[in-house]
């Protein structure tokens, strides 16, 4: 960090005789530091600057710049505070950007952190002239200290910003609200008494001033809101002239009570007893980068508490969705009125209209959130409730005589920008969750609490089963009869709650033990789209963690239905192939009638238990990145982008404007049907054969999952332009070793495609030195045959040309015509209304591999 203050030299015009008050703030840009890193506040007070020698001719003013490397450590080099004399750079008597350092001095912060200097101290500033330091100036330092930031002060300073109005920013919300709620952070064990930080009297005075100022602002805001509500309160005479006042006055009073209670919950420091300075002091969590994905805070009480986050949270079942965050502030004091209950019943009975109002309209989002909020139990504990799925209404009609809510949760949520990488896992266009909001079921938490018994001991394995289809329901029934650690998930909220709880328990184990935990084996039983949901949660959660977390979990793939990753694992591990890729297993979970005739259910349990106990070899599956750019909903709106991790296959389809229906905006609808294809496409099947074979929507093939209902299978022709860059082969890299830049070649395909498929799965079991992808395309070609008599050309269609291109490092795909939108299938999850997309062979964060357990790298002998 650096801060500059301009000072005038003696005798120079505009010299300042009064001290310049400045506050120095560090930009927290560190994520790889140790969990014990504690933010500190450096306070520096300068008294006088004395220039002993002439710095430069015709120098009228100088700038005092203070610079510190952040983070600084107690026992490491570079822990220095630099104070520099600088001047603005000039070119031909014109001031340009930048500063030139005239003299500099440094202070060892390791000594300051242990013994703050309160007396007078003189720092010599030296100028380097011909590699010989010459003392040219001196600075008198009154005080210099470095103190940990008080958790209580930070919360109090954040109070007026994050909880008063909508004028706060997202950065303030994340840094003060979300971070401090993360009670599973390693810093949470550092409960220190306030006297430990009591170094000097100015610190106490500053704390009391900050607390008094923030509480004054909160009280002023509350008084303004109360005065505003009373100003618009309808008098009883007016109510008597309209209707019976008994019908409306209680509702108004309940609304006011709800508002007051909400303000009291959100501003707990308004009253007298809370002003006593007797609470313990917590250090704030370590500074970190803005997360790639914005998820819920990893609270240790996550198995019991759920809350409302936003209407965008549950966007993509069965892909991960944010578990709500705000119910904690709404529980306890709310009373459900009859009017609200009637509103819930009416809105739940209204069917969803196909062409309703946009999802971002405040009417739709606010009404949905209000209904969902009031339906929650008064305690706010999810463990008390069963699954709650409430259809939202698309119409703006309300019951006659009913008043709207005076406050809504939407008004207290921070604005979330669209083009934000942190929001990339929140799909903003999913149709399923526009029609319903979900919260985790009680049975999920019951199963988790039964498996995760204590913080001191972690289970060896956990089996997550997707019970939203018949395959998962059948498998869960079989496994539960044998008392295996099964967690049944049937919605995005269930998956989110289960995975977040596992991560939270691992964090609590790390906080209680000095040794790292033994890797927890997490079996994922479901189709490809279910693994995609787990992968996104894995990337989201571990992007906030240190690299050590990459070794705390191992995943086991139990395929139920179409699963390209399972086919790949079968090609590198023959025992895995015999267990889960043989004909008996595929027939059992691909044909609905097969389960009724199955008598040997112990064989299923035996395969799974042998796989869990015997698969101890970690196969690092590379994670690729897909960046989708959606069309804007209005001309004034910018295009939104999403970053999606994937490990398997990406397929492309196209939607013509003529065949576009109201469902075109329903992107990211998971291709999970209750009936799976009886013959899932294998890796050896040609793309043309896949195109011609009729498959149900659950199959991720282009013909079944991407074609419009009005289009035939043979009419799936796509006019695309594909730009791709191929990485150099190992032999080419040796030949070009002398070159600095890695050679890449750009190629372009611009033609009519029958199918386009990009795979990140390695071509062989061994990981390549350079991360690359492979692309398989089937193009439609025309052969121009010359007719000599009429001398005209006649187009004759020939067989489709199939082509496989390997070694691709980056790929960009867009439609030939801008009005055509793409449908992209990423690991079994469909996304539509895509203008163009880009694929990169490697994920950009430190989470670059997905650890999967196999028996060993041994190819099958067949």
From Swiss-Prot:
It is found in: Endoplasmic reticulum; Mitochondrion. GO terms for cellular component: endoplasmic reticulum; mitochondrion. Residues 151-215, 263-436, 658-713 are annotated as: Disordered. Its main location: endoplasmic reticulum. InterPro entries: Phosphofurin_acidic_CS-1. Residues 313-328 have a biased composition (Basic and acidic residues). The keyword Mitochondrion applies. Residues 263-272, 658-693, 700-710 have a biased composition (Low complexity). It comes from the Eukaryota. Keywords: Apoptosis, Endoplasmic reticulum, Mitochondrion, Phosphoprotein. Residues 332-344 have a biased composition (Polar residues). GO terms for biological process: apoptotic process; autophagosome assembly; protein localization to phagophore assembly site. The modification Phosphoserine is found at residues 361, 387, 424, 662, 665. The keyword GTP-binding does not apply. Interacts with BID and PKD2. Interacts with SIRT1. Interacts with HDAC1. Interacts with TRPV1. Interacts with WDR37. PANTHER family: PHOSPHOFURIN ACIDIC CLUSTER SORTING PROTEIN, PHOSPHOFURIN ACIDIC CLUSTER SORTING PROTEIN 2. Belongs to the PACS family. Multifunctional sorting protein that controls the endoplasmic reticulum (ER)-mitochondria communication, including the apposition of mitochondria with the ER and ER homeostasis. In addition, in response to apoptotic inducer, translocates BIB to mitochondria, which initiates a sequence of events including the formation of mitochondrial truncated BID, the release of cytochrome c, the activation of caspase-3 thereby causing cell death. May also involved in ion channel trafficking, directing acidic cluster-containing ion channels to distinct subcellular compartments. This is Phosphofurin acidic cluster sorting protein 2.
